[in-house]
Amino acid sequence: GLLEVMDGGTATGVDKKAGGKLIVSTNALEVSGTNSKGQFSIKDGVSKNYELDDGSGLIVMEDTQAIDTILDEHATMQSLGKDTGTKVQANAVYDLGRSDQNGSITYSSKAISENMVINNGRANVWAGTMVNVSVRGNDGILEVMKPQINYAPAMLVGKVVVSEGASFRTHGAVDTSKADVSLENSAWTIIADITTTNQNTRLNLANLAMSDANVIMMDEPVTRSSVTASAENFITLTTNTLSG
C-alpha cells in the first residue's frame, strides 16, 4: 500500500511493513511511527535521524530541514530545503534543488546539502549548493546537472572526495570555483553543454588532487544533428593547484 503525508497532514502511529510505500513531506504537521529500521518522527519542519527503508521517500520543502537522514536501498529523497549529514546507500537516489510531485516539477536555488556521504548510491544536483560531499563504490554517482533556465548554476563548495571506483559527472558550466576535488581510483567526466552556436564550457576549480584517476572531457552523449556544423563547443578547466 501507499501512504502519502504531505503539507499540513498528520499521521501518528504509522507501522510501515515490508512492501509498503511511505512518502512524507517535511511540511507535514507531524508524522511518526516505525519502519523496518526503527522509530521515526518528523515535526515542526524538522526531520531528524530518519532512516528510510525500501519504498520510503522524503521530500524536504523550502525553509525546512532534515538532519542525519539515511537512505537505504531503493529509498528516495528530494530536497528543496536544507539537509545535513545525509547518507545515500546502495540503490538509493537523492535529488538536490528539484522536486517532482505527481509530475509537477519544482526547482530551488536555496536548497543546500552539507556533509553528505554517498556509498554506492546516487545523488543528482539540479540547483542549490552542496557543501562537503564524499562518494565511493563502483556504483556511487555524484551528478551535477547543467544550469536550469532562470536558476543560478548549482554550486559545489568545500571538499568533493570521489573514491573506490565512484563516478563524478558535471554538465555544462556548474560552479566549482570554491571546490577542492580529490579523485582516488575514480573518474570525473566533464560534459559540455552542446548548443547550436559556439560555446565554451568553463570550469574554475580551487584545487584538484588525483591518484590513479582520470578527468574526461566530452560532448553531451547525444546526436549532434541539431548542432550547426561549424559550431565549436569546447571545455576549459582552470585550477589553482594540481597534484597527483
Locate predicted features.
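The right-handed parallel beta-helix/beta-solenoid scaffold, focusing on the short coil/turn
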Residues: G1-L3, G9-T12, A18-K21, N27-L29, ...
